[in-house]
Amino acid sequence: MVSRFLLTEYRNLTENPSEHFKVSVNENNLTEWDVILKGPSDTFYEGGLFKAKITFPPNYPYEPPKLTFTSEMWHPNIYPDGRLCISILHTDNVEERGMTWSPAQKIETVLLSVISLFNEPNTDSPANVDAAKSYRKLMHKEDLESYPMEVKKTVKKSLDECSAEDIEYFKNAVFNVPAIPSDAYEDEHEDEEMEDGTYILTYDDEDEEEEDDEMDDE
């Protein structure tokens, strides 16, 4: 049963790729996925491509998967060994703030929640105490440099560890992004929204092709 659930979710994610993450599966073990999470814009993590592994239990989706970062991370809710502490991956038997796991959850929801956590950490029960202390000092304007500096180190290291293929994936691919507000691209990408709801993230060759298509239509 677990294979059927995972195959369906994996197919949905690959047929409708996200600009925020990339997933791939271990061909020899469907219960192990590799994922790359893109650091969200306008945060200290912007520009980073952070690698992680998702491990699914035998009774998934009734038990949550586990997500462990393989990239070096500096975040209050990520243990130094890469294990992630987030409410959505806990059952209701664990006292955690926020939404907990249910069999109705989708991996896409989990990954978007992780990305959201980058900029909204929970410092009440931190997994990385030093990162939490540094973040609190940042929030209280006691130290505006230490936390951003440590995060930027991980951003650079994540890119050094990424393949050129993965970097190009996030740079050049076409994605369906229905959840993004229509005005999210109004400055830099105002003219790049397509009729089917996709966005092209680089425009050199594509713009020329669109112009040629318009001329052909005329």
Curated annotation (Swiss-Prot):
SUPFAM superfamilies found in the cross-reference section: UBC-like
GO CC, one annotated term: host cell nucleus
SMART domains: UBCc (SM00212)
EC number: 2.3.2.23
Pfam families to which the protein is assigned, alphabetical: UQ_con (PF00179)
UniProt keyword terms in alphabetical order: ATP-binding, Early protein, Host cytoplasm, Host nucleus, Late protein, Nucleotide-binding, Transferase, Ubl conjugation pathway
Induction: Expressed in the early phase of the viral replicative cycle.
Catalytic machinery residues: 85 (glycyl thioester intermediate)
Residues covered by the UBC core domain: 1-160
Reaction equations catalysed: S-ubiquitinyl-[E1 ubiquitin-activating enzyme]-L-cysteine + [E2 ubiquitin-conjugating enzyme]-L-cysteine = [E1 ubiquitin-activating enzyme]-L-cysteine + S-ubiquitinyl-[E2 ubiquitin-conjugating enzyme]-L-cysteine
Cross-referenced InterPro entries: Ub_conjugating_enzyme (IPR050113), UBQ-conjugat_E2_core (IPR000608), UBQ-conjugating_AS (IPR023313), UBQ-conjugating_enzyme/RWD (IPR016135)
Gene Ontology biological-process entries: protein ubiquitination
MF (Gene Ontology): ATP binding; ubiquitin conjugating enzyme activity
Pathway this chain belongs to: Protein modification; protein ubiquitination
Localisation per UniProt entry: Host cytoplasm; Host nucleus
Superkingdom classification of source: Viruses
TM region(s), chain numbering: none
Required cofactor names: Mg(2+)
Coiled coil: none
Cofactor details (free text): Binds Mn2+ ion which is required for highest activity. Can also utilize Mg2+ ions.
PANTHER family: UBIQUITIN-CONJUGATING ENZYME E2
Role of this protein: Accepts ubiquitin from the E1 complex and catalyzes its covalent attachment to other proteins. Performs the second step in the ubiquitination reaction that targets specifically a protein for degradation via the proteasome. By controlling the ubiquitination status of specific host proteins, the virus may target them to degradation and thereby optimize the viral replication. May be implicated in the shutoff of protein synthesis through its interactions with components of the host translation machinery.
Assembly with partners or alone: Interacts with host 40S ribosomal protein RPS23. Interacts with host translation initiation factor EIF4E. Interacts with host E3 ubiquitin ligase CUL4B. Interacts with host RNF138.
Name under which the protein is recorded: Ubiquitin-conjugating enzyme E2
Species this protein is from: African swine fever virus (isolate Pig/Kenya/KEN-50/1950)
Classification of source organism: Viruses, Varidnaviria, Bamfordvirae, Nucleocytoviricota, Pokkesviricetes
